[in-house]
Amino acid sequence: MSLLQSALDFLAGPGSLGGAAGRDQSDFVGQTVELGELRLRVRRVLAEGGFAFVYEAQDLGSGREYALKRLLSNEEEKNRAIIQEVCFLKKLSGHPNIVQFCSAASIGKEESDTGQAEFLLLTELCKGQLVEFLKRVECKGPLSCDSILKIFYQTCRAVQHMHRQKPPIIHRDLKVENLLLSNQGTIKLCDFGSATTISHYPDYSWSAQKRAMVEEEITRNTTPMYRTPEIVDLYSNFPIGEKQDIWALGCILYLLCFRQHPFEDGAKLRIVNGKYSIPVNDTRYTVFHDLIRAMLKVNPVERLSIAEVVRQLQEIAAARNVNPKAPITELLEQNGGYGNSGPSRAQPPCGGTVNSSGVLALAEYDQPYGGFLDILRGGTERLFTNLKDTSSKVIQSVANYAKGDLDISYITSRIAVMSFPAEGVESAIKNNIEDVRMFLDAKHPGHYAVYNLSPRIYRASKFHNRVTECGWAVRRAPHLHSLYTLCRSMHAWLREDHRNVCVVHCMDGRAASAVAVCAFLCFCRLFSTAEAAVYMFSMKRCPPGIWPSHKRYIEYVCDMVAEEPITPHSKPMLVKSVVMTPVPLFSKQRNGCRPFCEVYVGEERVTTTSQEYDRMKEFKIEDGKAVIPLGVTVQGDVLIIIYHARATLGGRLQAKMASMKMFQIQFHTGFVPRNATTVKFAKYDLDACDIQEKYPDLFQVNLEVEVEPRDRPSREAPPWENTSLRGLNPKILFSNREEQQDILSKFGKPELPRQPGSTAQYDAEAGSPEAEITESDSPQSSSTDTNHFLHTLDWQEEKEPETGLDNTSPKESQSVLIADGDGSEVSDEEEASFPSEERKPGAGEDTPRLAAGTKQQDLIFDVGMLAAPQEPVQPEEGVDLLGLHSEGDLRPAAPLQACGVPSSNTDLLSCLLEPSDAAQVGPPGDLLGGEAPLLLASPVSPLGLQNNLQGKVPDTVDPFDQFLLSSNSDTQPCSKPDLFGEFLNSDSVASSTAFPSTHSAPPPSCSTAFLHLGDLPAEPSKVIASSSHPDLLGGWDTWADTATPGPASIPVPEGTLFSSAGHPAPPGPNPSQTKSQNLDPFADLSDLSSSLQGLPAGLPAGGFVGAPAPTQKSNSPWQANRPTAPGTSWTPQAKPAPRASEQLRSHFSVIGAREERGVRVPSFAQKPKVSENDFEDLLPNQGFSKSDKKGPKTMAEMRKQELARDTDPLKLKLLDWIEGKERNIRALLSTLHTVLWDGESRWTPVSMADLVTPEQVKKQYRRAVLVVHPDKATGQPYEQYAKMIFMELNDAWSEFENQGSRPLF
């Protein structure tokens, strides 16, 4: 009988396992199973386990293959475990690194032929187990570090998805055998039969029985080699939770790196003590050593969380410039590439191994033929079916190329990118259009629109006629009007319904799709630069491989939707010639080229310089440059292609030649300023370049151009003319606030300015009168960024300062849009969407929007000044001698007569130390219209200027009213002789309007009353300072001496007046007792002491006066050790005061030459010690206050002040470090010592002299990485800070390498 049974088993085929189980398995193969709407035919056995089989099944309708898991159970406990596995898989399905759940079904044991309950679980079919691929690769050598990084990162992403569930799902049986390789080459985690949501927290109250029960349950669901110390020894009372998956991941990483398990024998003692060893001589995987140690900690509390593991892997990937989400191509290449048919076919292990947890072990069987009885049992129908299956294997072997997962990526939840949806045979290597339709209909039923960017078309009915055909040409940037129209269309579709999504595709879902999606992200104001958008696309899908022209057109869109948009003009442009400097080396001898040019406008070729070979000029290196004359007028999208003409064998006789493309340039004329004469493109701005050796160093291409002054409107109005920018908000790109915050945390790094290697320049000459007529039509820049697209333009409009809205958050942008009016309709998406949150600037957490004008990195205009003169703007930097640019409070000044100060045309310096309250328009006879004292004058306001023009007494004094008032102003109340009329007279209206709008009035405390020298009192002060010479400004020494407050500081009460000796000065005399007016304007110049008197009591708190002295001869020195000439700055001779402000040391010496000065005699009285706050209300009005007591003066200071409120001080310190040195490896290394944390002594500062050659830079960079590498700071308080420094250095090093590792000189 046994012999007969063996014979039947032999005839049943090689798939038989023998006995009832084998017959059950064989009986199931070939059957048709219905799961929901799917009708599947079971084709063969893939694997078997303790109570489960895995089959390959094919959908009879679509031909798609699936993995069908058949689970058998005869116990209620097993039933619950199976149902739980199905529930977990269904809940976790959808993640790219977890096997996809499709369907499930079950029947009771009463209905089953096996007498057991049956459960069917349908999932996607993967290529095979990772173990088998690793074995094949490792036979040829160790696995590369990048491949291990991808494998482990994708595995951790799957575990992270499990741990993020509520409650967290713990896999408990993570091992390399449970990792599958998809047809696309990505990792898929499978087998959730051991997963649970229950955590255990043993303590001393647990009984031995309870510990034994828990240990038994855990042992049944885990693999011995991967068990954790807390599981092996429950009496350690460590918590048993998600950290057991971290331990298993550490074992997997160790196994991937060193091809052996850290606890190969599963010895409990070694596991409990964490005894494993990393090979000492390993240098290939050193980057993973610290990560392995951190994951294999005995105490689970000390192990890294899965989020920390993923973050460290991302940092390693960024440092190695690897996309960790990409397919593991090394495994696919070693195993036949993407074209392998079906999953890997491995030989079955002996007897089919089954572990203690009942997990499926590999038992794949090759079944190239069926058993003899299979044919007899199925009859002729089965025979022809098998023949049909065999004939279809050729197509199936090709169809498995990248099949199994659709090539579709979600940039956001509402923007998707995929490759071309193909039909027919082509669908074997591309997305099948039916699969795409089914996927989109299932996920976004009725709410998706497809945008086809490729020149090929297909039936729009496949996607319910919601297909937009764009037809963009390949290997060039799209036309601007087409790109802008596409962005408008996508925005309108997303606004219709908050459930709508946009699906964009070209042929491969790369360059063209990246341009469209990145431009749309910028159109919605998520980013303001192309670099940030392209980076997000690269991380969400793949590196797009775009050209500089693609990026240029994305920047065009950024400019057009900026806060102050730049609209392209409609002026034609004459391209005179193309100049290449130096001569490119395209000849066979590498000594020159024979170039010719083709120019396209849109799709039409407008000119070519191609001629017969001998008639085209050949340029040599000695020529220095190659010039191609053109003389063609273009407008709109311009494409210039430069070819090298090369003679072929026998070509001269046949008048034939071969052309070799050298490069091409594409741009839009609407963004070239009207006065540009030369457009310069660097080597990095050129498209379709050949090998770098053919382009000499500093190679650039210049277009000699001339922009016509008149507009030439196109036949059709461009789409941006009548487009309202209201309502553009980045939140339309997301489905909820959490998604937006996640995007900001990943891609919200502050956008970097343009890099030097990707900029071009524009030269221009003085504008002609015709050009000035159309001057206002030129696109204008709104940014102060030095690397702006139009930064170096010197247009006349730039007399008005640029007020770019730096760091404008989305919330601020929204408020601006709302403030524009209520005409914009709020979409349904915006009404139902999450509330907009303001983005807070950070080092790497948010995305502060840079100035709206920081665009067009590819083009910079270098334009000369126009013929129209420009009014100079007084800079605010340098020594502020008279406080002309300091800020102060605008306080109305009282009339001069109210203070009891007489009018005089001879008392030149009486108002030198008057309070600001004593200011009034001078009476007749005042030489310069003395209206305010030199030092204490109140600042001017625009209102004061208007009052002067209207003949009224101003509330505040304008120190430069004589300079600003017109000479023909007959309404001025002064009738005094105009002694300085010739050089003080100017047109006030022209002068005021010539200044920028933000400087229409002088700065608040621009006190220039040194020319207002009238109104000097005659009576000397009742208190005489102990000085042998008159010292008008002697009290200033007190400032320098007492700048640092001491214990003897004397508080100054409100309204108290101090002399230079520190004693309170009595109030001034009655106005009736003052000296009468003198006729000689300079008579009292030598009797200065007589012009000093007690000042009125209206002086602000903290005021003081200089020390007057008895009358001296006219030739007696009156100021000791003063500067040589009036108007120059000087420092009073006093004892050193290191902390004194520099502004307190620079003043005007109004009168007195060198020969008139003598030796200063010190005062007999002790000088007072006052605090720095005693003159708080005095100094701000005169420009002598410290800068830290004033508000920010510049936009940069305002941004820093805003950052300081919400940002970590360490991040602020890092931002200050990289400011102005973004991606400049030399600058960052030479200043690295300024940002290192306290106690770091391994780094020795380096200078620029140590960073001249690329070798020196590389050496210092490696030293710096050893110091700041985050792995060396694990667990330290400065760990996060070290990570930020490391990332900045790494970005700078990558940029240094991308630019060719050039030497400094």
UniProtKB/Swiss-Prot annotation:
Record-level GO BP terms: clathrin coat disassembly; clathrin-dependent endocytosis; endoplasmic reticulum organization; epidermal cell differentiation; epithelial cell development; establishment of skin barrier; forebrain morphogenesis; Golgi organization
CDD domains hit by this protein: DnaJ, PTP_GAK, STKc_GAK
Domain C2 tensin-type: 570-708
Biased composition (Basic and acidic residues): 836-848
Location of the active site: 173 (proton acceptor)
Gene3D superfamilies xref list: 2.60.40.1110, DnaJ domain, Protein tyrosine phosphatase superfamily, Transferase(Phosphotransferase) domain 1
Residues of the Protein kinase domain: 40-317
Protein name per the record: Cyclin-G-associated kinase
Native source species: Mus musculus
